[in-house]
Amino acid sequence: MPDGTGLVEFGKRFPDRFFDVGIAEEHAVTFAAGLALGGMIPVVAIYSSFLQRAVDQMLHDVCMQNLHVIFAIDRAGLVGADGETHQGCFDLSYLSMMPNMKVLAPKNAAELEQMLEYAVACEGPVAIRYPRGCAYQGLTDYGAPVMTGKSEIIAKGKEIAVLGVGSMLSDCEKVCQGLREDGYDPTLVNVRFVKPLDVELLDCLAGDHSLFVTVEENVKSGGYGEHVAAYMEACHSESRVLTASVWDHFVPQGKVESLRTKIGLGVEDIRESIENSEVLKKK
């Protein structure tokens, strides 16, 4: 799907480096594995919902052999007008279970470029997931180098830590603004790496944060929030984790903003969930 993935111009400029395999996702991944074995660095540009068909090939043909294949995952998260079957709300779950796979999510267009450069330079399989539509141009004042398994602190506070995954970070910034207006001093984190988990940052924040809030456009089961919750329960049981994610059902067609509100991922929904949490009520 060269048009949908934005690769029409690339295909015209570099016809010998562009392969349209049609609607054959399984073949695309195994083809990329073969290219990697031949010494090339293939980039598989594909929709999140379509990549689900190639989970077996990703596991056995790419990850098991730890091949250097880059997955550029378009339409990740809520896609709105594309329809119910195109909602990309499962990729963080099925990607995170794969050994050797690194899973990244950029906050804006500039960071997507950084992550692509990182993916080309590193070894092994890398997945970068980003949303449908025009690239977000905000939060440009923050651009620390991309380092394996390292998140980025946007604002340092105390008591509440809000951890936003990829495209949700801009809304997380609005959530934090609302919390500050209500007298709180939240920390805002750009997750960057869903896998490997930045446990060093979690350990550091656990010292002066009692509530960790994860925000992602992915189903809760197997998502970033569950991985954070499992780690915190094992290593910092005094801290609590609130996960803001997609409900356990299929999301219908609709505009992204209205869908977020409908499933409890709107800015005000998240802020209210934080302020109504048992952790803050006890203080």
Regions found by a protein language model. Name each.
Residues M1-G124, C134, ...:
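Thiamine diphosphate
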